[in-house]
Amino acid sequence: MSGLGKRFVEAGYTDLKPFIPVDGKPMVQHVVELFRETNTLFICDQIHSDKLNTICPTSKVFHSVHRGLGPVDAVMCAESVISDEEEVIVSYCDYGTQWDYKTFLADVREHLAEGAIACYKGFHPHHLGPDCYAYVRENDKWVNEVREKTPFTTDKMNEYASNGTYYFRTGRIMKEYFKSLMETGESLNGEYYVSMAYNHMIAKGMRVRVFEIEKMLQWGTPYDLEVYKMWSAYFHEKPRRRLRMPGITLLPMAGQGNRFRMQGYDTPKPFLPIRGQMMAVAALRDLPETDSTTVISLKSHAVGQYFPGCKIVELAETTNGQATTCMAALDDVDDNTPLTVTACDNGAMYDPDRLENLMNDGSVDVIVWCFTNNPTGKLYPHMYAWLDVDDSDSIREVSIKKPFATKPNTHAIIGTMFFRKAGVFKAAYKHIVDHDLRTNGEFYVDNLLQPLIEQGYSVKAFPVDYYLCWGTPNDYRTFLYWDDYHSSSH
């Protein structure tokens, strides 16, 4: 804990990184509670002492001066107070973990390992981004090599990565190989990382074990922490009242779901499970209730049994876009009927009072639901339509599947729109067909917006509090990951 947490300071945090609140308690307290040990040594600046004594009253604090040489150097500054004979775990202070500590200790002791690294492998959402960590090349859970900040393959998710927990059978072993690392000058950007000491141990014939954890909670950067806090806040939210709105809801779900099929999903995307119900049903239940609902689906999907009380429009084949799919259900809908169009692959949590006020404003012709805070927009910016919004939430411009080059990309469409009159939708659709206004060769509902804005219609953005994207395999897996974590007793 001798680092300065510079990125968090630059991001505007006033608390020192280890003491930033996460789920109601300081970040470092989560780390301390992973081990449930009484013999804990904090290596940190003197100003941390009082807070640390509160978090772990049985702990000791070694005051160090920040030298910028990394965690190995910080630990070696305190070598005089670390026992040579006892087991030692060196842990970073900026992560959470779902695991069984007793099983970890039993495993390393049973296998007589001189060292061990707690690792994760497979799908973990923070690995979707560009950041890299400490990676392990292993055979049958025995480490062959460790590489810091650089994976061994192009598929980093399927390599073991360290969570920041490092075990040594004795303090003597740890000190010897920390010294060896520093003597060889093997640093990265001027810092000596704990993980790299294991290569020196392995070269001398010592055995280093991999222990696989269940979940890795990455809090090491402001972005990582904000992503975690967003998901945590959503899963701790209480249910909100469901609005009642006039008109009809259209749920088009007549696509092929190619991205899911290419990744081995046999079940069509709208039928995949979300918290015990079908994805498309979950999407509808997050919306206001309207007078009626029409589901537009491929005939081969036979969806009628899943939507009792809804009108079903079956198509023989896919259309040239979502907007065209919607038009297949609008022939017998009066032009003055309010219309809500939504996607089948996302959920949302929103302020019902704010939406109700917007609905009651008769001057607003179109309401576009959007998000401002979901990491999927940063990871996949070219998959969204972006909105240029003024201070009153009026939309000035729409850029579809292409972020703005000279404007901030703060608002992205989530796939739900309200048209005060179905006739406005129909006329806008005719306009984009007549002018061949497509995106990626298709007529999207998003394509209707820019012509309506240019024709003088009042088109407003409605930012939701939480956007739940299930539209791609990675988005779907991300939701399931956090749902599983927050549903379990961790």
Label each residue range with its predicted role:
Residues 159-249, 335, 410-490:
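Conserved alpha/beta core of the MobA/IspD/sugar-nucleotide pyrophosphorylase nucleotidyltransferase superfamily
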Residues 7-9, 13, 21, 25-103, ...:
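Conserved N-terminal catalytic core of the sugar/cofactor nucleotidyltransferase
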Residues 66-72, 123-126, 216-219, 317-322, ...:
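A short acidic, often aromatic-flanked loop/helix-cap motif at beta-alpha or helix-coil junctions
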Residues 98-185, 349-435:
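Conserved core of the sugar-phosphate nucleotidyltransferase
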Residues 19, 135-138, 210, 271, ...:
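A structural signal for short hydrophobic beta-strand segments in well-ordered beta-sheet cores
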